[in-house]
Amino acid sequence: SEDGQAVVEENGYISQGNTGAFKSTEAEGKIVVAGSSSVTPVMEKLKEAYLAINPNATIEVQQSDSTTGMTSAMEGMCDIGMASRELKGSELAAGLTPTVIAMDGIAVVVNHNNTVDNLTSEQVKEIFTGKLTDWSAAQ
């Protein structure tokens, strides 16, 4: 919702644009949200905003990691899974539907003594997958 995206932006994430105004249905009951530790801070803020207009609802946010969140959603242990990555093919095949609520920036930093000063996204990927194992190959 527009309100949710405002919360996303206020907390330093990149919003996904205006998705319209949220209209409270005065929901009741409990929702369990589980997963990514990097999504948890913004989810806690979204929880606060939601509960401010739906005081009879209960939201439990369980912090772990993306895979645990997706597994918990697939197994019915939580209502909403949080992931800070794209869903895997197996997760999509299991029926999970992704909804992007925000994007976060990731920075790669090298020691100031390192002569490498301009890495491409592909080179970073190759470093972390082990394809590039020597800095000289990244220059």
Residue ranges and their predicted role:
Residues S1-Q139:
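Flexible loop/hinge segments at secondary-structure junctions
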